[in-house]
């Protein structure tokens, strides 16, 4: 756990650093934590200094009470984290929620560090093609959302998350339970899930800024995509190939929304092929 100053407030942030070599920053998705990278980290750490952390409100990081969570604040947190660790040229691997934050960092073109390469996994790259789950939509409805948030127990959490995994690689309930408990631990109320979901309308409201950043950036981009994803799968991959015929896109035909959890060995190998210097 380290302490960072984010927007003038002191925040306790869970960070895990392993391995040696060029810096590789891992940015997790909703509704999980940095633990979702656990199966990949040992292999990645053979070639990289791997930095995995929990966003504000997630996992073991601080969950401030009555807080209005924002992808822009999370980007501020990443900037503060890299400054604290004195990392100036990381490669970034980002998934889902983390990929939206990574896109904001690309849009900022910050001067304090340079993203060497950005490897993005399934996320709402094109807002118009993003398909949130029904329970997510309902959770965002005033009144109903608060009731649903309070009703979200471990069983419902596991069932809802499991719906976005492929039939070939189903969600392990024991792993999902760990993420559920991490989300609840330290939360000042039972509606943390609802508060964090604010990223969906925030992403939609900033669609032009974020999509323009991806279309115009000079940062090298790679995409690792689970094609069985009902949220942000084949339709987004198809649109990506249409927009960028020369795109570096790896398609996992048998994986759903979470390819790094469903096929960690393949995803780790594909990350290393793009981020680690070739061995002599």
Model-identified regions with their sequence ranges:
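Catalytic histidine-centered segment of alpha/beta-hydrolase-like enzymes
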Residues: 255-264
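Active-site loop/oxyanion-hole signature of alpha/beta-hydrolase fold enzymes
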Residues: 6-9, 16-18, 52-94, 125, ...
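Conserved HGGG/HGGXW glycine-rich cap/lid loop of the alpha/beta-hydrolase fold
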Residues: 16-60
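Conserved serine/cysteine hydrolase catalytic core
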Residues: 189-242, 251
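Helix-rich cap/lid subdomain of alpha/beta-hydrolase
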Residues: 130-184, 190-191
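Conserved catalytic-core motifs of eukaryotic protein kinase domains, centered on the activation segment
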Residues: 36-38, 61-67, 130-131, 234-235
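Alpha/beta-hydrolase fold catalytic core
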Residues: 1-24, 45-48, 87-89, 245-248, ...
């Amino acid at each position: 756990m380290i302490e960072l100053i984010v927007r003038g407030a002191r925040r306790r942030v869970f960070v895990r650093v392993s391995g040696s070599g060029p810096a590789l920053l891992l940015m997790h998705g909703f509704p999980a934590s940095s633990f979702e990278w656990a199966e990949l980290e040992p292999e990645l750490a053979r070639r990289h200094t791997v930095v995995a952390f929990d966003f504000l409100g997630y996992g073991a990081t601080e969950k401030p009470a009555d807080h209005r969570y924002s992808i822009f604040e999370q980007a501020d947190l990443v900037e503060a984290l890299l400054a604290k660790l004195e990392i100036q040229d990381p490669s970034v691997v980002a998934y889902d929620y983390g990929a939206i934050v990574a896109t904001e960092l690309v849009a900022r073109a910050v001067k304090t560090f340079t993203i060497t390469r950005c490897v993005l996994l399934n996320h709402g790259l094109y807002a118009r093609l993003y398909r949130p789950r029904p329970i997510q939509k309902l959770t965002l409805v005033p009144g109903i959302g608060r009731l649903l948030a309070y009703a979200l127990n471990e069983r419902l959490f596991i069932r809802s998350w499991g719906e976005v995994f492929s039939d070939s690689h189903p969600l392990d309930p024991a792993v999902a339970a760990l993420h559920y408990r991490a989300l609840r631990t330290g939360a000042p109320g039972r509606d943390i899930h609802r508060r964090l979901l604010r990223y969906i309308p925030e992403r939609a409201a900033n669609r032009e800024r974020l999509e323009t950043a991806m279309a115009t950036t000079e940062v090298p981009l790679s995409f690792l995509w689970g094609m069985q994803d009902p949220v942000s799968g084949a339709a987004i991959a198809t649109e990506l190939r249409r927009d960028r015929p020369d795109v570096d896109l790896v398609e996992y035909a048998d994986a759903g929304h979470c390819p790094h959890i469903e096929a960690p060995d393949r995803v780790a190998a594909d990350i290393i092929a793009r981020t680690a210097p070739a061995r002599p």
